[in-house]
Structures are given as C-alpha cells and as structure tokens.
Amino acid sequence: MSESNQATFQGNDPAAHAPDAAAYDKGKGKAVEDMDVSMDEEEEESEESDAEIMVEDEDDDGDSNLEPVSTENIISGGRRTRGKTIDYQEAANKIDADEMDDEEDDDEDFKPSDK
C-alpha cells in the first residue's frame, strides 16, 4: 500500500521527515494556546486599579452631610405647579386645535400637477 493511506502517528509523521520540516507548523493541526505572561499581568493590574477606584468612591460618600429630610419641604396634595391650577381638558383641546391647524397648512402647500 502507499504511504498516503496510512494513519498518522507521532512516529509515522510524513511532515517530520519532509525536507522542509517547517511545513509541519503550517495548515491544520492541534491548536496550542501560547500563554502570554504580559497579558496576565495587565489583567491583574487592571483588577487592582478597579478595586482601588471603588474604595475611593466609598470614601467620597463619607464626606457628604446626610441630615434627615424636614417634613416642611415635602409638598402635600400632589401639587407640583407652585399653586397654579391647570385645566387638563383645556390643554388637550388646545393641542388638538394646533394639530388641526398643522394639517390645514400641509394641504395648502400641496399643489397637484396637471399632466
């Protein structure tokens, strides 16, 4: 039989006996992950710096003055308009009227072309 039909074993690797042994590194094969030590160090440094930043943020909270909220500052009755009474129905009608005016303006801009 020819050598091309044989199973590939470590001892029977045709690429290892080839004149160009560098060809063994090319093409498909088992992927070997190279560990890059410098990347690991950078990750550790970034984790440490994140932890330091979080500690600094916690220190900032300690400087603020957290006094209890006075009940005199709380608005009762849901009033958020500084005493002005708003008629919501009137406001809705005004918005509808404005939309109608816009539609009429659009009709005036359109001029049919005569062919």
UniProtKB/Swiss-Prot annotation:
UniProt keyword annotation of Chaperone present: yes
Stretches with biased composition (Acidic residues): 34-64, 98-109
Keyword Nucleotide-binding: no
Comp. bias intervals (Polar residues): 1-11
UniProt cross-references to SMART domains, sorted A to Z: CHZ
Record's keyword terms, sorted: Chaperone, Nucleus
Chief location of this protein within or outside the cell: nucleus
Subcellular location: Nucleus
Cellular component GO terms held in the UniProt record: nucleus
Bias (Basic and acidic residues): 23-33
UniProt superkingdom: Eukaryota
Pfam families in the record: CHZ
Bias kind Low complexity: ranges: 13-22
Oligomeric and partner information: Forms a heterotrimer with H2A.Z-H2B, stabilizing the association of the histone dimer. Also, with a lower affinity, forms a heterotrimer with H2A-H2B.
Function: Forms a chaperone-bound H2A.Z-H2B complex that acts as a source for SWR1 complex-dependent H2A to H2A.Z histone replacement in chromatin.
Family: Belongs to the CHZ1 family.
Protein name: Histone H2A.Z-specific chaperone chz1
Name of the gene this protein is made from: chz1
